[in-house]
Amino acid sequence: MKDSWSSNSTTSTAIRLVGSPYGTDSPFQPTFTYPIYGEAETIYGYEGLAIKLSVASGSLVPLLEVTYRAKNEATTAEIDDVEGKIKEFLAPDFLSTSSPSAMEEFETVVKADKEFRPLGDKVHSYTRGKVDKGKAKSSTASLASSTLSASDPNARVFEIYRSTWHTPGFREYHRRMQLFTLLFIEGASYIQEDETNWEFFTLYEKVSRDDKQTWHFMGYTSLYKFWCWPDSSRIRLSQFVILPPFQKQGHGGALYTTVYDQIRERANVTELTVEDPSEDFDRLRDGNDLRRLLAPGGFADSAKAQNKLHAPLDKEWIESQRLQHKLAPRQWSRVLEMVQLMNLDTTDHEQVKQYRLQVKARIYRQNKDILMQLEKQQQRSKLQETFEGVVEEYGDMVGVDVEDLLDDGPSGTGALYGADEEEDQEQGQGDRHYSNGNGPPRKMARLA
């Protein structure tokens, strides 16, 4: 079997948002294609295979074009049906160049996109400054913090719309945009349209030219509402995707913050949770939640003024704050521990010890089922290893040097209290636990 007849389905695929402004219409590759072409992400039977998916940047009508230099007609092995496999995941109204009129039809769609309008209710808008292509990389930070007026000629305007299955035309629109979840979210799957508890927040760029406005898709998130006894609900953020041309520019944070603000205003919602977050999303969420707690006059200032940040914590007060901020227990604990780290006196050995006990106890109780499967020495080793990883991550996030907390040398604060001394306290604090409704962690990498 010639290797030249095998193609990687991910690197062979190129996506382009046709009509997207300011240079964001360049082709980009998906992150995953295994939901479509199998775990090996390999397509057999073609040489020089190229899968081009052109998408109208507003309406998201797709045009599929599959080309190759040669097809292995001589083989007795099964040749993969490239178009047949991907069309199972495309919206029913997709176009394919296997039809002679498809290119012309797609050109008509792109022209008609000038009349496209976002579906649903606008819930937020924000601006970013226009950046020259040559300066884009160095200007990411300023883009994220721009507060230009929407009427400023140097402003780019972005809008977020909320939709449900009841929004006219949204079911059809969602069938087009859901493909991006498979291509950019590991483990994603399509959601069921007969489940009525879904809602969606979609991000667009709004472009004004010659007194006309057009809207161009950038990403979206889906949320699911769970009923909670007796008369409240939890909202679970299920899927979250920002397409590659718009990443690393603060748009993910803007979308997440908008969702959080919307949820927090709902009196009958107890908390916002996230379904199996990736490490990238954890960082995005941590940064935005932390920024909110550190806002002038906010939680951190209030807690510090009341001397509430030192371990052991006032559990009743902390829980009341969690309910007020509507963060899930694990996420609340993480950002709270970051705020505590920022206010920790690392020269105070007792403060350091109590902080370490608190963090380890939280890790232990959230992962007790997994840890109990290990020998006692392995438990202690894994707990210490995870603690060190967590604190290093926190230090990177908040800009605190944590070397003294982790130093195992004779003069390091971390060496003053051994695992034997802490073990009983860690496990004793583990008796009280939060239930997040999602069951135990799925893998050890999620210990923290």
Swiss-Prot record:
Enzyme Commission designation: 2.3.1.48
Pfam families (UniProt xref): Acetyltransf_1, HAT1_C_fung, Hat1_N
Ranges in coiled-coil conformation: none
Annotated GO MF terms: histone binding; histone H4 acetyltransferase activity
Active-site residues from the entry: 275
Enzyme class name: transferase
Localisation per UniProt entry: Cytoplasm; Nucleus
An individual GO BP term: DNA repair
Keywords, comma-separated and alphabetical: Acyltransferase, Chromatin regulator, Cytoplasm, DNA damage, DNA repair, Nucleus, Transferase
Region described as Disordered: 407-448
Superkingdom classification of source: Eukaryota
Enzymatic reactions: L-lysyl-[protein] + acetyl-CoA = N(6)-acetyl-L-lysyl-[protein] + CoA + H(+)
Site keyed Interaction with histone H4 N-terminus: positions: 198
Binding locations of acetyl-CoA: 240-242, 247-253
Cellular-component GO terms for this entry: chromosome, telomeric region; cytoplasm; nucleus
Region of interest called Interaction with histone H4 N-terminus, as start-end residue ranges on this chain: 39-41, 224-226
Lipid metabolism among keywords: no
Subunit text: Component of the HAT-B complex composed of at least HAT1 and HAT2. The HAT-B complex binds to histone H4 tail.
Protein family membership: Belongs to the HAT1 family.
Function: Catalytic component of the histone acetylase B (HAT-B) complex. Acetylates 'Lys-12' of histone H4 which is required for telomeric silencing. Has intrinsic substrate specificity that modifies lysine in recognition sequence GXGKXG. Involved in DNA double-strand break repair.
Protein name, UniProt field: Histone acetyltransferase type B catalytic subunit
Annotated organism of origin: Mycosarcoma maydis
